[in-house]
């Protein structure tokens, strides 16, 4: 590993990408401590046990409870991306047309997503500031008024726009997917505080139950290790489909008559479904705070509270649904079958074309079922465990956080590895 890290530093291009990414993350962390004007941030400390805001605060690296200019984080962008991707499924013909236009279409969709993020972010900023102030008994906003609320909403929206730009810069000039890296950094930044809370609760206040608390912490560590191993296994696992190439096929990637494999990941969607599910389940509750307490908003708060049995089921269902959705965004069976046919390749015992497409689709459905159930279980189990063990509420999203942190780390390592392999260096993973 140390040799691999040394290789990173030797290659100027990779070294510059890593340094650029780190500098952007430093900017992100600094922005998390710049407060929004006209806000008494001390009031928010009383709200840190509320799960809806706790999960947003974790993803933002503490920016929410600081009510900083980056308080909303990147969630409005993720929500906008979900909606735009769903609308591409023959809901909005123009979006569907753009999605089939290659790079040009992707640029148009990306630009529209940016605009939609600004609109969505502004609405969410108004709802969040108004709702937070109501929950704090009017003590959060020091100078309440239409002008103040508009100013706060503009500042928060600008913060989200800045993070969106920052993520794009990391993607273009740094390492990994910029948006995922920002979420990764936010989660990692909050780990010391969570550890400190667990230590204070389990050891400092343990009294004559210290031994029992030690056993509990050991169980927690074993559970974390099991989750880490499980996530790595699922993220790396592939199903190899045997592919044969006809003799005399000039376009095949291997000599005619030989066989190769088409690898399909057990979880081709990665951690994106979890991020999407978090954005989807927190947005309604955040917006509901704008309308105060009534039967409808109380129902929304209950339904989308992932610590409540109903909300837990909704959260798991969202993860499963988004895993299927994004798996077929990442893997296109029709395109795969078409490419194999053009290259003279076929699955033994299966006709090229439609039958090959159906076989790949069937395999992908089964693989995604395993991957989606795994993601849902890992995200939900820690919530149950925390409630049973009486751990701090900040640990409730431990499974979700681990999924994202490990998933993003693996994807980033793969990208760095590919950069090293191109330059004839050996990477992290053995081949």
Swiss-Prot record:
Annotated GO biological process: intracellular protein transmembrane transport; protein targeting; protein transport by the Sec complex
Membrane topology: Multi-pass membrane protein
Keyword Transmembrane helix appears in the UniProt entry: yes
Cellular compartment(s): Cell membrane
Keywords: Cell membrane, Membrane, Protein transport, Translocation, Transmembrane, Transmembrane helix, Transport
Broad class of where this protein is predominantly found: membrane
Gene3D superfamilies attached to this UniProt entry: SecY subunit domain
TM spans (from-to): 18-38, 64-84, 116-136, 146-166, 175-195, 214-234, 262-282, 309-329, 369-389, 390-410
InterPro entries documented for this protein: SecY, SecY/SEC61-alpha, SecY_CS, SecY_dom_sf
GO cellular component, as recorded: plasma membrane
Function noted in UniProt: The central subunit of the protein translocation channel SecYEG. Consists of two halves formed by TMs 1-5 and 6-10. These two domains form a lateral gate at the front which open onto the bilayer between TMs 2 and 7, and are clamped together by SecE at the back. The channel is closed by both a pore ring composed of hydrophobic SecY resides and a short helix (helix 2A) on the extracellular side of the membrane which forms a plug. The plug probably moves laterally to allow the channel to open. The ring and the pore may move independently.
NCBIfam families the UniProt entry points to: 3a0501s007
Family, per entry: Belongs to the SecY/SEC61-alpha family.
Family matches, as HAMAP family: SecY
Summary of subunit composition and partner proteins: Component of the Sec protein translocase complex. Heterotrimer consisting of SecY, SecE and SecG subunits. The heterotrimers can form oligomers, although 1 heterotrimer is thought to be able to translocate proteins. Interacts with the ribosome. Interacts with SecDF, and other proteins may be involved. Interacts with SecA.
Name of this chain's protein: Protein translocase subunit SecY
